[in-house]
């Protein structure tokens, strides 16, 4: 829900002057909410919420207020939208559901764990009478029965975690991607070569798609030796061998460069460590030369008795 940043229209200002008053809003809801909805609402808990869901460029046509309240089913909201324009919006039902979902989203972002009930209410003041359109958003579809069935049922789910690998192998052009995404978190993807190679040999994927999959394995997966994995795959799938060998060579080069960098870094760290030790020994030597007792020197420098024994006065 966003803050309003345009100058209020006379419609908007007047509407808000009244409907932002809880007592007036309570009267409005007692008068106009359907009985079955009014029965689930505790109107004594009405609380005005800040902001607006109406887009800035539409404020001359619409105004809205949002109230939170307690319902018999937990937290809830009543969103009142008033239409100022003379010609009614035939997609108003869809607008109402969009704003209701936006209110639900804001509720979740505030840290709540469950979706709230949001009751949209349209306050129509246009010239055309009576209001000519349905406020049931599903009626905006060509096939309302099918839309009702779709949006009131569980959505389709593809849970790859429960599909057997043998079944996945028969999924044609989706097989390789599905298999890899199912096992991407396993300990070592190199164990998948025996299953992956026959799928790639089936010829459903182009070389660019195979390369994309291998990069995905290297970047997102776990394998003890990525280069060896890719070389093995190149031998098993000769039609993509050149492309895969190119990747293997790139991985080999990266490994060499990483080894060089690691060696250089270790050399730097070793040199730094040796330099710090030499400086500490020098400080200890000076302290001993100034007749500071050995226990104090060891405590202040962290050196041991053996370290001090190496110091020549």
Swiss-Prot record:
Q: Does the keyword Magnesium apply?
A: yes
Q: Which domain of life is it from?
A: Bacteria
Protein's UniProt keywords contain Cell membrane? no
Q: Name one GO molecular function term.
A: double-stranded DNA endonuclease activity
Q: What is its EC number?
A: 3.1.21.-
Show the disulfide pairing.
none
Example GO biological process: DNA recombination
Give the UniProt keywords, A-Z: DNA recombination, Endonuclease, Hydrolase, Magnesium, Nuclease, Plasmid
Q: What class of enzyme is it?
A: hydrolase
Q: Pfam families per the record?
A: Transposase_31
InterPro entries registered for this protein in UniProt = Rpn/YhgA-like_nuclease (IPR051699), RpnA (IPR010106), Transposase_31 (IPR006842)
**UniProt-listed PANTHER family:** PTHR34611, RECOMBINATION-PROMOTING NUCLEASE PSLT051 (PTHR34611:SF4)
Concerning NCBIfam families, the annotation shows: T_den_put_tspse
Described by its record, this protein's role is as follows: A low activity DNA endonuclease probably yielding 3'-hydroxyl ends. Involved in RecA-independent recombination and horizontal gene transfer.
Describe the family membership recorded for this protein in Swiss-Prot or TrEMBL: Belongs to the Rpn/YhgA-like nuclease family.
Identification of the protein by name: Recombination-promoting nuclease pSLT051
- State the species of origin: Salmonella typhimurium (strain LT2 / SGSC1412 / ATCC 700720)
Q: What is the lineage of its organism?
A: Bacteria, Pseudomonadati, Pseudomonadota, Gammaproteobacteria, Enterobacterales
